[in-house]
From Swiss-Prot:
The lineage of its organism: Bacteria, Pseudomonadati, Chlorobiota, Chlorobiia, Chlorobiales. It is found in: Cytoplasm. This is Aspartate--tRNA(Asp/Asn) ligase. GO terms for biological process: aspartyl-tRNA aminoacylation. GO terms for cellular component: cytoplasm. It is an enzyme of class 6 (ligase). ATP binds at residues 233-235, 495, 547-550. It comes from Chlorobaculum tepidum (strain ATCC 49652 / DSM 12025 / NBRC 103806 / TLS) (Chlorobium tepidum). Its EC number is 6.1.1.23. CDD domains: AspRS_core, EcAspRS_like_N. Aspartyl-tRNA synthetase with relaxed tRNA specificity since it is able to aspartylate not only its cognate tRNA(Asp) but also tRNA(Asn). Reaction proceeds in two steps: L-aspartate is first activated by ATP to form Asp-AMP and then transferred to the acceptor end of tRNA(Asp/Asn).
Length: 603
């Protein structure tokens, strides 16, 4: 084939003129040059068929025996070898059309093959999605990334990131990169520390989030900031949390109120779901639920609203009850909660034993329940309740024959969480639609909480949030009654992000910290640079930072965060492919004035 001028799309060079997955019936008769990996190779009755794969898909090559030199060359190929091939596009016969491939109506009859790189035997097959240990997958991640599903996840992530950028820049957001080397903050998760060669004995830290920088950008007069921000936290892995590093869609705006931010975020998620996913949003605008309400109704501040169960408060029904377990938990600060499972009252004893076991795992002393059977109510607490209490329960909860009601009693927060855990436990009884995205905002978080261990008032979440009512609330309200402009966005039981309207006034900040037991000197020592900035004209501002990794997980139906990250660490925070973390040389340590002293058990 004659050499064509080089083009920006990577075609018309010596390797390819076309992409494998974009050849179709319209390509019939064309002379093409394609390149990629040998997905499969088969010898069928003297014909060699090669499935050639590039990032667009797969195309079938046919090597005829009369093309003797190329036939012999094809016989030497291994799976995952890299080749380029020239040939003519022909239509397949009707009986050999492969409808699963975009190029399934055609094949390329090969005139020549060039081996660019022959592959050694593989540690696991790429073409077949057979189960492979995670250790092997991570060690050979470059092979694992060739597998179709993982490959598509990474491409999807790229497209999603591009869509986020376009959505936000169209709304006049400015993308600004913040420092990766910054100062350490002992609050929150552990920092990753970076020793300074130029300043012996001192350390930088990788940012846990660009929080302070993005607020300083508001002070600097940038009205709308965003960044696809890398964040670093030295914390243990979970299925939805990668150890060490993760990415967030970091957003901050000045001169806004809480509702302004909600409108922009809801619009962004709606745009992403409608344009990049087959999933559907259950309710738009997203429902807003106060922290107190969400704990009372769902027992969690990250509820899965698809679960058709709701916790109900029945405390007042047992104020004068003869059943002391309930009656003793009717005073302020305690409660009696109930949850009805409709039509589940005739389950086996094993069902209730397993439920009680789960309740104990959640911290309960047991699990009280009543089955409403044809022959009358049954269960371990029936004998302790009066007929009037039973009737009041049935009326309050809408109970009919065939239902079962579960109870929890104790301190309000603990009881809510136990009942919320049981709600999640019973979720498996219901066919939840994985294509339904049930977003919600959790709002009106308490500003302060009582720290039982230290016997003092402490911040409940973000100490830099603006209290609702501002200075007046701090000066006139009981601390535990003060609410903050803090909010979480949740989808299907997964917290995507926390955010807040920030406290931009030093006087309010000093007062809030004073309530939590900090002196002005302590606040200045820890956060002096922020307060100094706020003293020079800080606008009202607020923000949020949805997790990019978790968002991709939800939209791609993945249960493990490592399935949406190109090069993740394992559960032990190790990169098996790059052998990190690793030892360094004595000279490197000497330059940094560092000496290693391992714990006794590791020596």
């Amino acid at each position: 084939m004659s050499k064509e001028p080089t083009t920006a799309d990577g075609l018309q060079n010596r390797f390819r003129t076309h992409y494998c997955g974009r050849l179709n019936r319209k390509s019939e008769g064309e002379l093409v040059r394609i390149a990629g990996w040998v997905h499969r190779i088969r010898d069928h009755g003297g014909l060699i068929f090669i499935d050639l794969r590039d990032h667009t898909g797969i195309c079938q090559l046919v090597v005829l025996p009369e093309n003797e030199s190329q036939f012999k060359l094809a016989e030497t190929l291994h799976s995952e070898s890299v080749i380029s091939a020239e040939g003519k596009v022909v239509l397949r016969s009707d009986e050999t059309v492969n409808p699963r491939l975009a190029s399934g109506a055609i094949e390329v009859v090969v005139s020549s093959i060039q081996i660019e790189s022959n592959a050694d035997p593989l540690p696991f097959p790429v073409a077949d999605d057979m189960p492979t240990s995670e250790e092997l997958r991570l060690k050979y991640r470059f092979l694992d990334l060739r597998r179709e599903k993982l490959h598509e996840n990474i491409i999807f992530r790229s497209k999603l990131t591009a869509a986020v950028r376009k959505y936000l820049t169209d709304l006049d957001f400015i993308e600004i990169q913040t420092p990766i080397l910054t100062s350490s903050s002992p609050e929150g998760a552990r920092d990753f520390l970076v020793p300074s060669r130029l300043h012996p004995g001192k350390f930088y830290a990788l940012p846990q989030a660009p929080q302070q920088f993005k607020q300083l950008l508001m002070v600097a007069g940038f009205p709308r900031y965003f960044q696809i921000a890398p964040c670093f936290r030295d914390e243990d892995a979970r299925a939805d949390r990668s150890p060490g590093e993760f990415y967030q869609i970091d957003i901050e705006m000045s001169f806004i109120e809480q509702d302004d931010l909600f409108v922009i975020l809801e619009g962004m998620f709606k745009h992403l779901v409608e344009n990049m996913s087959h999933k559907r949003i259950t309710q738009f605008p997203f429902p807003r639920i106060s922290y107190k309400d969400v704990m009372n109704r769902y027992g969690s501040d990250k509820p899965d609203l698809r679960i058709p169960l709701e916790i109900q408060d029945v405390t007042e029904l047992f104020v004068n009850s003869g059943f002391k377990v309930f009656a003793s938990n009717t005073a302020e600060g305690s409660c009696v909660k109930a949850m009805v499972l409709k039509g589940m009252g005739n389950e086996s004893r094993l069902f209730y034993d397993k439920a009680e076991k789960r309740a104990r795992e959640l911290g309960s002393a047991g699990l009280a329940y009543i089955q409403f059977k044809e022959e009358g109510p049954k269960g371990p607490v029936v004998k302790f309740l009066s007929e009037a209490e039973m009737n009041a329960l049935k009326e309050r909860l809408g109970i009919v024959t065939g239902d079962v009601v579960f109870f929890g009693a104790g301190k309000w927060e603990k009881t809510c969480k136990i009942m919320g855990g049981m709600r999640n436990y019973f979720a498996d009884l219901f066919p939840l639609d994985k294509d339904e995205l049930s977003f919600c905002w959790i709002v009106d978080f308490p500003m302060f909480e009582y720290n039982e261990e230290d016997k003092k008032i402490d911040f409940s979440h973000n100490p830099f949030s603006m209290p609702q009512g501002e200075m007046e609330a701090l000066e006139s309200k009981f601390p535990l009654d003060i609410l903050a402009y803090q909010y979480d966005i949740v989808c299907n039981g997964i917290e995507l992000s926390s955010g807040a309207i920030r406290n931009h006034r030093p006087d309010i900040m000093y007062k809030a910290f004073e309530i939590a037991g900090y002196s002005k000197e302590e606040v200045d020592a820890r956060f002096g640079h922020m307060i100094e900035a706020f003293k020079h004209g800080a606008p009202p501002h607020g923000g949020i930072a949805p997790g990019l990794d978790r968002l991709v997980m939800i939209l791609r139906d993945e249960q493990n965060i490592r399935e949406v990250i190109a090069f993740p660490m394992n559960q032990s925070a190790q990169d098996l492919m790059m052998a990190a973390p690793s030892e360094v040389t004595a000279q490197q340590l000497k330059e940094l004035c560092i000496r290693i002293e391992l714990p006794e058990e590791e020596k």
